[in-house]
């Protein structure tokens, strides 16, 4: 059974809860989103595995998950990037924000999200239990595709992508 770290609106830990229960009720919990870019400035996207309990088969950012109670968000980001995409990469936390979004089947993501960016030209070696496919996309192509086919993307990615474009100057930090 997996647990998430419950937090207040200042990201102070206030407890733990089983992950699926935290998405049913929903409770604010700590999360992270990774945006890896290649040297051409294209974003590495992943398609969620069809076996995922919510948002299966949808496209999202490079990696996103929840830290364990015993680890920092940076440690969790590195761990999950390796577990999902088979990659190691230096990353920098660039900002945080809170969002709440329904994800279908009566579930809602309510997250205090730590956003990390990094740069790598490595080829992913995906874990097919987590990831169905991957591709690189330019920011312009993503913006157009999200506008035309929003149903192809996870709810949190659409929110996080919009936040990321507002912080576009941060891309110079990678």
Predicted regions and their residues:
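Active-site segment of metal-dependent pyrophosphate-handling enzymes
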Residues: 26, 40, 82-123
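Conserved Nudix-box catalytic region and its N-terminal flanking loop in Nudix hydrolases
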Residues: 21-32, 42-79
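Acidic, metal-coordinating catalytic segment for phosphate/diphosphate chemistry
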Residues: 1-33, 39
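Nudix hydrolase/Nudix homology domain
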Residues: 18-20, 69, 98, 107-174
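A residue-level structural signature of the nucleotidyltransferase/glycosyltransferase Rossmann-like core
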Residues: 4, 42-43, 134-135
């Amino acid at each position: 059974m997996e647990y998430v770290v419950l937090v207040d609106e200042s990201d102070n830990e206030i407890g733990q809860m089983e992950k699926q229960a935290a998405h049913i009720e929903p409770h604010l919990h700590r999360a992270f989103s990774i945006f890896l870019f290649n040297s051409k400035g294209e974003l590495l996207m992943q398609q969620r595995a069809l076996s995922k309990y919510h948002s299966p088969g949808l496209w999202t950012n490079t990696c996103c998950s929840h830290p364990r109670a015993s680890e920092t968000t940076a440690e969790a980001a590195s761990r999950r990037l390796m577990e999902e995409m088979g990659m190691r990469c230096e990353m920098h936390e660039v900002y945080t924000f809170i969002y709440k979004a329904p994800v279908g089947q009566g579930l809602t993501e309510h997250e205090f999200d730590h956003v990390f960016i990094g740069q790598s030209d490595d080829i992913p070696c995906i874990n097919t239990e987590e990831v169905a496919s991957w591709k690189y996309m330019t920011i312009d192509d993503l913006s157009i595709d999200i506008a035309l086919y929003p149903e192809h993307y996870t709810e949190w990615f659409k929110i996080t992508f919009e936040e990321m474009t507002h912080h576009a100057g941060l891309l110079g930090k990678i």
